[in-house]
Design a protein with these regions (language model features):
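Ser/Thr/Asn(+Pro)-rich, low-complexity disordered segments
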Residues: 1-233
Length: 233
């Protein structure tokens, strides 16, 4: 069962990738019918997960190391040219052009959470290839530059001790979504603290994510005991 799950997961991201970018499609219709004409829309965060699935596929022998490297080179070449906003990627792009596909009316810029999901996948690729042959090392260095380009501090909205989910070149900070814990966004705070070029101070984690200890808030939801506060509850 585990072998089947791993292989099928790999195949979704390998065979189902958007042809130009090599990235994960936002949606896949088995009948090939796309009423919204969005077959070429790709997702940044989902691609971060897909990249790690491809690494597992290489290790499992589903494709050769050389085939995997070629796919990663295509992905990184796309990301180097695709729309970015202070180093952060949007939630969606058009895979054939690299231009942002708005996720919503005012969500046409950087999405720091989806960027974090993508960067964690890229960093896994970096570590996989950094001690390899010359082509592999070259790819790892290109990934390192993408990682270094993300301006996590910009997404503090004027230096606040919290990270904001969105910024738009058209609407600025109008989405107005500061991120507090606990939720799926913890990797964003970890990467922001670890950045070698735009690292945020510890207070951003303690005030923004952990809310100076208020993140610990034992309560029950439908009889299930939870120990951490979930943003929005």
């Amino acid at each position: 069962l585990m072998d089947t799950v791993q292989r099928r997961t790999f195949l979704y991201f390998w065979e189902g990738a958007e042809p130009n970018s090599g990235l994960a499609p936002e949606r896949y219709h088995v009948d090939g019918v796309y009423p919204q004409n969005d077959a070429n829309v790709v997702t940044s965060g989902g691609s971060g997960f897909g990249i790690m699935a491809i690494l597992a596929g290489i290790d499992r022998g589903y494709v050769t190391r050389e085939e995997g490297l070629a796919r990663m080179e295509r992905i990184v070449s796309f990301l180097e040219k695709a729309d970015r906003f202070h180093g952060a990627y949007p939630h969606w792009w058009y895979g054939d052009t690299g231009k942002v596909k708005p996720f919503g009316q005012k969500d046409n810029g950087g999405d720091l959470v989806e960027t974090a999901f993508l960067i964690q996948g890229l960093l896994a690729v970096h570590q996989y290839y950094i001690n390899g042959n010359e082509k592999e090392k070259a790819l790892a260095q290109r990934i390192d530059q993408i990682w270094r380009d993300v301006d996590w501090n910009w997404y503090r909205k004027g230096g606040q001790n919290v990270l904001y989910w969105h910024w738009s070149p058209t609407y600025g900070w109008e989405m107005d979504f500061p991120i507090h814990g606990y939720n799926e966004c913890m990797i964003m705070y970890i990467l922001a603290a670890a950045s070698p070029t735009h690292g945020v101070p510890a207070a951003v984690y303690h005030d923004g994510w952990a809310q100076n200890g208020a993140i610990v808030s034992p309560h029950k939801v439908e009889g299930i005991e939870l120990h951490l506060r979930y943003q929005g509850t």
